[in-house]
Amino acid sequence: MSVLGVGPRTVTPHLRKGMMESSSGISLARAEAFLRLFAILVLVLTACLLGFDTQTKLLFSTIKKTATFRDLGALQVVVYVDSVAAGYNLLQLGRGFISAKLKGKLINVSYVTLPWVCFLLDQAAVYTVFSANTAALQASIIAVTGESSLQWMKVCNRYTRFCIQVGGALLSGYLASLLMVLLSSLSAFSLFRLYSPKQFHLLKPT
């Protein structure tokens, strides 16, 4: 028996379950913080790789043309979407930090509302980032292969370095999408663990 009179046998199953859930919640919060920080870095990297990618070439022996991400609308969308997504994840990271610091000091109107909001926002963010990246990939393939039926010439045979950097940015964008899928999965777990596994739409007792 311990000095305080609380030995291993005196710990009730309810208390033991609460301690395990608390430990699980801390581990989940740390995993989410790590993934969000990593996602922010990758999203910023993607936006910077595209935003600062330029290459100037002499065309037809007389005309200088500089290729930038603004020449392809899909690349512009990726830059803007990834920048907004990075800002969103930064806000979520700040929200998690504040929640950890103020835990137990704030009165929540509904403890299930915030997990629902985070879940829906994470879902929307990952779909938007993935869709923008895929649209840019499809447009970039045309720049590589050309499209004779539409009289679109190949571009990457002239702007090789520019296209290679775009390819690296798109790979980075898909990595960011994967990280955000993991974040969305964590949000789903954090939300649906609040519900009873035996009865649909019934919250667990707090």
Swiss-Prot record:
Transmembrane segments: 32-52, 72-92, 112-132, 162-182
Cytoplasmic compartment spans: 1-31, 93-111, 183-206
Organism: Vitis vinifera (Grape)
An example Gene Ontology CC term for this record: plasma membrane
Name of the molecule in the record: CASP-like protein 2C1
UniProt xrefs under PANTHER family: CASP-LIKE PROTEIN 2C1-RELATED (PTHR33573:SF30), CASP-LIKE PROTEIN 4A4 (PTHR33573)
Protein's UniProt keywords contain Magnesium: no
Entry superkingdom: Eukaryota
Phylogenetic placement of the source organism: Eukaryota, Viridiplantae, Streptophyta, Embryophyta, Tracheophyta
